[in-house]
């Protein structure tokens, strides 16, 4: 009775502030460790590279050739520094921050997965919502502070040395990083709340992070192979729409989806506007992650309020999460195995049979190993039946023309141009030869104006040439050919 009365006296804001300050003090050691590691491994390394680049470009300009303009050197130096910064963020800073995020979240919320600890924490004179949000805010403060300090330090030193990349660009990179870190934190805490054990939450995060991109990639590859003329390539935003951990790397990836698709399925089709290497962070992408972060935060609050103490040391406090993740990973493995063995055998029967068997086997394995409820296996087959129906609808839709996609000929007014994809010449069977043969280049001698910011005034310039048909008569001819093929 005493605990109940005392819990009503303090406001939610006051309780939040107490938990926030207590958690910051409690985690100061790991926070200092995170700051020290990121400073040493990211900032110091980047600044050393910047000093080395400055020395190469400005202290010994004669090594780059004669008649090199200072403006050209400054431009090249800025580009090198910017590329080094993005590389360091993708390979050092973001992975370290993610490791700190996961470790801190598990350390902070592990009391929810121990029956004695959860009873003790829930008996404290404090409401659940301030307890949850105070801990999350403390972790987010450390993450954001470390990211801001490192990036602003590197940016300030780079600009002092003459790097001309925009401060708006740097703030944009920082803003995207902070937003996705917030989404990753909310997603991690949601998994910890929804699962009854730490191991269950970790496995759920791994399955979701691997399963969704694999499902999207395999689905896009099947659509390309089934619908003539389709050049669908899953964009980085779609591949990482449900995985904020991977979405952190989208602006820093270079052609990742293209090479992944070619390596897995042998499909050389590549569209720069739809690849992971587009490096485009659109307003819609930002709005999407703002919405996802808000939904995950609300889900954390609602789930934690209704979470029973008896859920500790159980597999799941909310079984609905395992149904969704199992659906995704079973479908991804089924489609992936179907593509592999279908291409290997060249048989449609093998393709469909493998899709059914692989997805069913994955469903059984996740039920037995991850969920650990063998007695519930017969009942869980109802959810696998839903997956089988969804896959059947997908395959039937593709077999019947993709809802009219195959038979649709765009109107002449809707066509800006038609790209001609020439077959090229093959010298051997290597991927490099194929990619080289698909590249058309034109080399010309170019004399540029005196005020042009280039290394040499007289230069040989190479242009990438892509055959296009833009005249009305050419478009009409191709449309007639398309209609003839359909007929």
Label for each model-derived stretch:
Residues 83, 137-201, 205, 213, ...:
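Secretory targeting signals
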Residues 326-333, 364-406:
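Internal/C-terminal transmembrane anchor helices
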Residues 88-117:
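Long, hydrophobic alpha-helical segments
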Residues 380-387, 397-487:
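Function-determining sites in protein domains
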Residues 199-212, 356, 379-391:
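Central hydrophobic cores of alpha-helical transmembrane segments
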Residues 2-6, 12, 48-82, 214-303, ...:
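Terminal transmembrane helical anchor/hairpin motif
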Residues 108-141, 312-313, 481:
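Helix-loop-helix units of permease transmembrane domains in multi-pass membrane transporters
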Residues 1-35:
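Aromatic- and glycine-rich beta-strand/loop motifs that create alpha-glucan
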């Amino acid at each position: 009775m005493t605990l109940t009365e005392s819990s009503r006296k303090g406001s939610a804001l006051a309780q939040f502030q107490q938990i926030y300050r207590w958690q910051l003090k409690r985690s100061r050691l790991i926070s200092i460790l995170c700051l020290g590691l990121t400073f040493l491994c990211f900032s110091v390394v980047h600044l050393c590279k910047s000093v080395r680049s400055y020395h190469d470009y400005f202290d010994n300009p004669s090594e780059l050739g004669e008649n090199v303009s200072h403006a050209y050197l400054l431009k090249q130096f800025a580009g090198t520094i910017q590329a080094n910064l993005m590389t360091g963020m993708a390979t050092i800073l973001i992975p370290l921050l993610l490791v700190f995020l996961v470790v801190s979240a598990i350390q902070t919320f592990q009391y929810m997965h121990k029956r004695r600890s959860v009873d003790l924490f829930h008996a404290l004179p404090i409401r659940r919502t301030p307890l949850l949000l105070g801990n999350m805010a403390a972790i987010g403060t450390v993450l954001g502070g470390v990211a801001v300090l490192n990036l602003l330090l590197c940016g300030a030193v780079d600009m002092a040395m003459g790097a001309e990349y925009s401060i708006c660009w740097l703030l944009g990179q920082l803003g995207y990083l902070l937003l996705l870190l917030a989404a990753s934190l909310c997603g991690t805490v949601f998994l910890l709340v929804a699962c009854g054990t730490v191991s269950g939450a970790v496995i759920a995060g791994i399955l979701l992070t691997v399963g969704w991109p694999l499902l999207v990639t395999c689905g896009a590859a099947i659509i390309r192979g089934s619908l003539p003329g389709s050049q669908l390539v899953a964009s980085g935003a779609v591949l990482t729409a449900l995985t904020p951990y991977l979405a952190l790397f989208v602006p820093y990836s270079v052609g990742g989806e293209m090479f992944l698709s070619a390596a897995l399925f042998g499909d050389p089709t590549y569209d720069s506007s739809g690849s992971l290497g587009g490096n485009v962070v659109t307003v819609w992408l930002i709005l999407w992650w703002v919405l996802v972060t808000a939904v995950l935060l609300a889900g954390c609050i609602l789930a934690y309020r209704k979470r029973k103490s008896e859920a500790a040391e159980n597999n799941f406090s909310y079984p609905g999460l395992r149904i969704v993740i199992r659906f995704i990973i079973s479908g991804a493995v089924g489609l992936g195995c179907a593509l592999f063995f279908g291409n290997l055998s060249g048989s449609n029967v093998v393709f469909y049979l493998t899709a059914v068997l692989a997805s069913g086997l994955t469903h059984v394995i996740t039920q037995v190993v991850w969920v650990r409820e063998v007695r519930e296996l017969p009942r869980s087959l109802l959810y696998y039946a839903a997956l089988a129906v969804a896959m059947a609808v997908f395959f039937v839709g593709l077999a019947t023309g993709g809802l009219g996609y195959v038979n649709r000929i765009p109107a002449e007014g809707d066509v800006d141009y038609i790209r001609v994809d020439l077959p090229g010449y093959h010298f051997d069977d290597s991927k490099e030869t194929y990619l080289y043969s698909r590249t058309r280049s034109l080399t010309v001698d170019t004399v540029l104006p005196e005020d042009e910011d280039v290394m040499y005034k007289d230069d040989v310039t190479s242009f990438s040439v892509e055959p296009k048909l833009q005249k009305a008569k050419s478009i009409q001819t191709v449309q007639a050919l398309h209609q003839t093929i359909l007929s």
